[in-house]
Amino acid sequence: LNEENTVEPEERDASTPSPVLIVPGHLFFVDRINLPQALESSEIDDFAELSLENLAPFPVEQLYWGYLYSKSAGSILLYASYKERIKAQGYQHIETYLWVLPDFATLFGAAFSDATTLQLEGDESFSRITFAAEDSLPQQIISSPEVQKLEGEHAPLRLKLESTEVN
């Protein structure tokens, strides 16, 4: 990669990790997984990791991954990306971050009274996100580096991501 394609965090004391690195959503695999009814809240972390181990072609240690959970949804939204894929995009000093998240995770907790489809536009990614009425976990997320791949039906709500520093 040349220097023009390199994304670097602001200079900071290496002993103080930055909390969050937000990267384009299209770099992540996403799956909504129903939770077994008998599953206790304390078991969700283990369930998510086991689910990921069954789905991912790479060991969990080689992934940036996480999940979104809403108690009322009865499911989790599992997301993962191969660490080398993120590094290949030019992100440097990733180890200084506590979390590496897809841009669509910034909408966690959003809920709409009616079924809603929105388009989240970042600098390098476009995500079409579909919510069922009153559900804070998306039913579906389709992300792409090109907006043309997501066009078709009209997304009634468009949101533009702005770069921000999270401290």
What are the language-model segments listed below?
Residues L1-N167:
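Hydrophobic/aromatic-enriched cytosolic interaction surfaces used to assemble or bind macromolecules
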